[in-house]
Amino acid sequence: MNIAGNLYLPKDMDKSKKHAAIIVGHPMGAVKEQSADLYAVKMAERGFVTMSVDLAFWGGSDGQPRNAVAPELYAETFSAAVDYLGTGPFADREKIGAIGICGSGSFAISAAKIDPRLKAVATISMYDMGAANRNGLNHSLTLAQRKQIIADAAEQRNVEFQGGATKYTSGTVHEITEKSTPIERE
């Protein structure tokens, strides 16, 4: 799977040396050209080699279905960026870190837990998307509801394996009611 990224180099960089590098991941539901590029540019202005990335399934990166929610593959996006930077001419492979914005904060941390090549992680307005997907926003799903979601997903796998229609979830409520949370109303 190809991962799209924008590479930024410090102005007046000594190209005969390797430099510390930072990978910047965008918020959930965004693309690199939004806030991730801004952070990448600003960190390049401070002397870092930087790369903003589109998470797998988003923006210019490969992956179907588009805009899928796959936290384990999002963590892999950061490792793929380490592969690229660490084998290129500008980045010191022993000095590569990550900045994760919003949902990418949790994906960067997940990547660093399993990829020791990521030497530092910083988060900006981090939101744990994995926990939100497992437990609902603000832990709003009961254990029984979570078990039902898993059972429904298992049954849907059977349906799709046997040629049935793919079922997608929107990730958002379909109707605003008096019981809707402020986040749902937003």
Language-model features: where?
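N-terminal cap/lid segment of alpha/beta-hydrolase-fold proteins
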Residues: 1-21, 71
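Active-site glycine-rich loops that stabilize anionic/oxyanionic intermediates
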Residues: 19, 26-31, 102
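Structural cue for short, hydrophobic secondary-structure segments
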Residues: 24-27, 52
